[in-house]
């Protein structure tokens, strides 16, 4: 992977990542949003439909794909690209967050994490080395190191020990990645909870090891929005300007805008797809909750500013009807729209940075939402 920083507008960055794959070179424009394909599919969507929304890179889930279908099945197909028939770039998370989410079902040691398989109950073990091996078999274009996602709230002492172990795991991830001869990209993950001192140690330690990109992890795990913004604003300047920066698991449209304001290049989140299945649809001036009875006979398009398949062909009344009847098509049309909304938002952001009017875009974005612009700590 090659990353090129093309221009900036304040602290907002406009760049591109280039990946060499057997099918040729693929470019991902940044800032980028990655739809989540947990089990090797963006729920309810074909790869062609996902691509039609504007997506250039997807996220796959190492933990879930390891448990099912497993490495052997993946190897028989070639890799995850062949398995799911998406031949563009894929980033896979390391499994660290999913293990963190298991709570009492897991036990963390220096060697790795022992936990109960949520599918069949057997005890299994995941280590930095094993995570690198799974992601190698997945053929991930961007591999994430194995880390512990520090919970919120956490004491300084817990966050410090967790961050220090994640740094040791980062080195072990780097070593095993290199031993495997993996020629793809490996990203480090900054941890340290809500403590700036720990974030600094983590970032500097990761830069010393050396990675192709750097993620900010351990955010959007329950902390107040102001805390997330504070830590993000503190952390991103510590990361190399010539490497992509990734905010993991975030988030709402406002979170993407705030991340870009603070120098982030990459995002992923289940929100557009999960919310679509629950009738919660993102539009230019806010949210449409399509299950609301007022849409029963509303013959207008979902969003007159949107060019997606759903908005070009169907009314709010039809989407309301499909949802009420529990029709699968409703979830699919909602998903197409939400994913296109996110990609249109990123397109608008990229254009605003190119034209050096990102601050104006931020004001416009919040104005059409009827919201105030959140302050930066360092305007």
UniProtKB/Swiss-Prot annotation:
Substrate binds at residues 93-97, 147, 191, 218. The keyword tRNA processing applies. Zn(2+) binds at residues 306, 308, 311, 337. Binds 1 zinc ion per subunit. InterPro entries: ArchSynthase1/Queuine_TRR, TGT, TGT-like_sf, tRNA_ribo_trans-like. Residues 249-255, 273-277 are annotated as: RNA binding. Its EC number is 2.4.2.29. One of its GO terms (molecular function) is tRNA-guanosine(34) queuine transglycosylase activity. Belongs to the queuine tRNA-ribosyltransferase family. This is Queuine tRNA-ribosyltransferase.
């Amino acid at each position: 992977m090659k990353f090129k920083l093309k221009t900036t507008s304040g602290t907002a960055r406009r760049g591109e990542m280039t990946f060499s794959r057997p099918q040729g070179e693929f470019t991902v424009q940044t800032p980028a949003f990655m739809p989540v394909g947990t089990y090797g599919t963006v729920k309810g969507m074909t790869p062609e439909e996902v691509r039609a929304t504007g997506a250039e890179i997807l996220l796959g889930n190492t933990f879930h794909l390891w448990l099912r279908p497993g490495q052997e099945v993946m190897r028989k197909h070639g890799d995850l690209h062949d398995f799911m028939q998406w031949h563009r770039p894929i980033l896979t998370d390391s499994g660290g967050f999913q293990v963190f989410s298991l709570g009492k079902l897991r036990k963390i040691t220096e060697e790795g994490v022992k936990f109960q398989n949520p599918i069949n109950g057997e005890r299994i073990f995941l280590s930095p080395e094993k995570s690198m091996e799974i992601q190698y078999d997945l053929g991930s274009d961007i591999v994430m190191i194995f880390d512990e996602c520090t919970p919120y709230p956490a004491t300084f002492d817990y966050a410090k020990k967790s961050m220090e172990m994640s740094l040791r795991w980062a080195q072990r991830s780097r070593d095993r990645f290199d031993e495997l001869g993996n020629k793809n990209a490996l990203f480090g993950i900054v941890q340290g909870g809500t403590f700036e001192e720990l974030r600094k140690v983590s970032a500097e330690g990761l830069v010393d090891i050396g990675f192709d990109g750097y993620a900010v992890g351990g955010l959007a795990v329950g902390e107040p929005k102001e805390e997330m913004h504070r830590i993000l604003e503190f952390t991103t300047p510590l990361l190399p300007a010539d490497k992509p920066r990734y905010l993991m698991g975030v988030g709402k449209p406002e979170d993407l805008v705030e991340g870009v304001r603070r120098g982030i290049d990459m995002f992923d989140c289940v929100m557009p797809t999960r919310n679509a299945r629950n009738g919660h649809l993102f539009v230019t001036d806010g949210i449409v909750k399509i299950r609301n009875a007022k849409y029963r006979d509303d013959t207008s398009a979902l969003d007159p500013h949107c060019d997606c398949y759903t908005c070009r062909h169907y009314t709010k009344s039809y989407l309301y009807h499909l949802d009420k009847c529990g029709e699968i098509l409703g979830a699919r049309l909602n998903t197409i729209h939400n994913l296109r909304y996110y990609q249109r938002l990123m397109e608008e952001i990229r254009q605003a940075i190119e034209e050096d009017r990102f601050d104006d875009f931020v004001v416009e974005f919040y104005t059409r939402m009827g919201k105030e612009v959140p302050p930066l700590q360092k305007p």
